[in-house]
């Protein structure tokens, strides 16, 4: 028996409303949440067409093998940034004509693996062993309305298609639980004499990888309490009378990161010449959502962890893209983009995007519409309340980096020898005393 997908009814209405308009196919993304028992699909969004594709609409015999894999993969990467913790790109859908119904499976398989590879490359976290790794492909025939739902294990390159159940249901995410967290980020990334020549982006990613371990190993307080991983998240919560669907639970989460290593871990300090540093500082707003069907604490904590890691990494990546796109000259201080939330109609879930200070609300609205193919209202935009907007500072000591050349490198062995002599000075002194004593004894017995 394959996996079961519980799908919001509005997703079915959206898919039914898509008109091919002479195109051989239309493809897009399915967004939702995985759980051990079943998966939930709460949103579908078609991939926006390329501008140059508008001139090729009149080609009815186009093959699905010509599906622009790179363009669809980039769309998935962009949309993944707009998902708070707990939500993922669950898979893809494709709507085709009857003539092309048998020509889609290979193209879908390649696309689903390409998307997963692209999105996983940017992650600061690793997939756990017990995590659901199946992703869905949904094929709809525009003529017969027949649905074919299959899954692939994206962690297994040799995975073959498995059938899955596709079931519509109303108000799937109307009572999902939200977890809110504000994290103060203070990441110091020293630049060694060798890494100072690397790009700001590469050095930042290296530092974020080390910081991610702190977040992964942190202690998470949910409403001020530490709960066991296998406990029910709603344990101890009062049940509301009447319609439980109308009540949305919200949890406050705080993160305690470990400053010192445990006593059973030995630490050795690495001393190196630094020619500068990169610093990330500020408060970032994090938010995660989890289904209300007996959710576990470990699933909620994992959703929060990943949102913390994703939002910081995404902000840095957006900054680097902006610097490259607009050819902004290097400077010491950069302001990271702020997070903006927007509600999903009929749901307690909010999606997100990022804006720089000089971007207008209209630009953010248009970006939401382009990426998610859903109209939103400007008044629904919620800019995250970040008291200190996260920023990045970069300082490079050019003199230090220039003086630390290969000409000075031969001195390092001398320093090492000197250190070794200091470390073994006691042994040397003892040896000298022993030699002196032996000499005196020899002289004594000679007399």
UniProtKB/Swiss-Prot annotation:
Main location, first listed in the record: membrane
Pfam families found in the cross-reference section: ODR4-like
One GO location term (cellular component): membrane
Keywords: Membrane, Transmembrane, Transmembrane helix
Function: May play a role in the trafficking of a subset of G-protein coupled receptors.
PANTHER family with a match to the protein in the record: PROTEIN ODR-4 HOMOLOG (PTHR33966:SF1)
Protein name: Protein odr-4 homolog
């Amino acid at each position: 028996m394959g996996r079961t997908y519980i799908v919001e009814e509005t997703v079915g209405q959206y898919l039914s409303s898509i008109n091919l308009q002479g195109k051989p196919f239309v493809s897009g993304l399915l967004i939702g949440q995985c759980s051990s028992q079943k998966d939930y699909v709460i949103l579908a969004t078609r991939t926006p067409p390329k501008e140059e594709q508008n001139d090729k609409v009149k080609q009815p015999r186009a093959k699905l093998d010509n599906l622009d894999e790179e363009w669809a993969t980039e769309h998935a990467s962009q949309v993944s940034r707009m998902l708070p913790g707990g939500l993922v790109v669950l898979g893809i859908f494709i709507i085709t004509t009857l003539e092309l119904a048998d020509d889609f499976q290979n193209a879908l398989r390649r696309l689903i693996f390409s998307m997963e590879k692209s999105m996983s490359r940017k992650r600061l976290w690793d997939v756990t062993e017990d995590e659901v790794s199946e992703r869905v492909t949904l094929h709809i025939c525009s003529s017969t309305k027949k649905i074919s739902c299959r899954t692939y294990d994206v962690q297994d390159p040799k995975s073959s298609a498995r059938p899955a159940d596709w079931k519509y249901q109303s108000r799937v995410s109307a009572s999902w639980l939200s977890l809110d967290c504000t994290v103060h980020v203070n990441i110091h990334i020293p630049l060694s004499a060798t890494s100072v020549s690397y790009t700001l982006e590469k050095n930042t990613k290296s530092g974020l990888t080390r910081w991610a371990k702190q977040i992964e190993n942190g202690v998470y307080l949910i409403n001020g309490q530490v709960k066991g991983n296998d406990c029910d998240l709603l344990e101890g919560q009062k049940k509301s009378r009447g319609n439980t669907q109308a009540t949305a639970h919200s949890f406050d989460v705080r993160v305690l990161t470990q400053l010192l290593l445990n006593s059973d871990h030995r630490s050795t300090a690495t001393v190196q010449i630094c020619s500068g540093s990169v610093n990330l500082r500020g408060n970032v707003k994090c938010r995660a959502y989890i289904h209300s069907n007996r959710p576990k604490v470990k699933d909620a904590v994992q959703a929060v962890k990943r949102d913390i890691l994703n939002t910081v990494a995404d902000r840095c990546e957006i900054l680097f893209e902006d610097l490259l796109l607009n050819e902004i000259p290097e400077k010491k201080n950069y302001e990271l983009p702020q997070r903006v939330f927007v509600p999903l109609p009929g749901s307690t879930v909010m999606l997100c995007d990022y804006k720089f200070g000089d971007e207008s609300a209209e630009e953010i609205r248009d970006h939401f519409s382009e990426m998610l193919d859903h109209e939103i209202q400007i008044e629904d935009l919620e800019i995250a309340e970040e008291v200190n907007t996260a920023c990045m500072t970069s300082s490079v000591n050019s003199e230090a980096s220039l003086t630390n050349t290969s000409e000075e490198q031969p001195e390092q062995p001398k320093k090492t020898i000197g250190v070794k002599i200091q470390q073994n000075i006691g042994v040397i002194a003892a040896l000298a005393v022993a030699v002196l004593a032996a000499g005196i004894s020899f002289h004594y017995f000679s007399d």
